[in-house]
Amino acid sequence: METARVLVAADKFKGSLTAVQVAERVTAGLRRVVPGVRVETLPVADGGDGTVAAAVAAGFERREARVTGPLGDPVTAAYALRGSTAVVEMAEASGLQHLPDGVFAPLTATTYGSGELLLAALGAGATTIVFGVGGSATTDGGAGMLAALGARFLDADGKPVGPGGGPLAELAEADLSGLDPRLADIDLVLASDVDNPLTGPKGAPEVYGRQKGASEEDIAVLDAALAHYASILGPDQAALPGAGAAGGIGYGALVALGARFRPGIEVMLDVLGFAPALARATLVITGEGSLDEQTLHGKAPAGVAAAARAAGIEVVAVCGRLALPPEALEKAGIRRAYALAELEPDPAVSMAQAGPLLERAAESIAWDFLLR
């Protein structure tokens, strides 16, 4: 099919391939079968880790800043800038990747560095900031972030409370008067695939605390501490969608920074220029490491497929592992999915050989959809 124009808009395969590498491998596989096929690549992300990399691949400039990591030590964090729009990924400053293997600090990990990263974007002239939240090592309700931006959180003796979510149980006063005045003049968009509230059975500690090393006792402590924190800052916002994102940093951004919440993939498709790229395509290839129930709830492939289906463009997906029945794929707008596990059932081998296997999957797509 000489007129075929393929848009590759896939997320990363976590632990094996970045979104950029996925696009490269899919392109190579397609061209092995149809050398002249026109392929446009647009690596995507949903606001979690990989969001800055996707923006850079779309033409944003990569910037770096030295900030405070989740354990209090300095780390280098990247953000992306194009004109007056910045893409800031909280995981770059406060993510799990900054913790040594097996080391967690569920009660004391801080988002202070995320606030410093926002300051760097402000200093670079950003007036619109897309704040991607996900992959955090923290459950501090965004208190660390707000402290870096000029807020003060004091105990009953007028002393600053310690870092992390646990010490918020001692909070007596929250003073937001020192927040950087530039924050009042920007559009801060909270981009997340998580719409959980701050606390309760579906809140940040209960749903995500365990993956950050929290014990059952820690979860109870954090939930109570964040509820107390919210009672002082503003209890109404604690129930808003996205308040529980990234250990509650969503709440801090909503209650104190005037942020507006949008599903991460919707924001990123806008920022990355997906609509004009889609208009040029006759076939879309999306995907991520695992296509499962979570995919259907705000993950990148679901967002890409929904937009493509609305435009009447056929969508196929690539993945490492497929855990959705055909009817669920069809409902999501995905015509067919190609899983690396079908080519190599051993998960360890499949991850290690993800690149070559993905090229083989793309060859199959070319035979099935470009030469039919």
Residue ranges and their predicted role:
Residues 1-133, 137-372:
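N-terminal loops that bind phosphate or other acidic moieties
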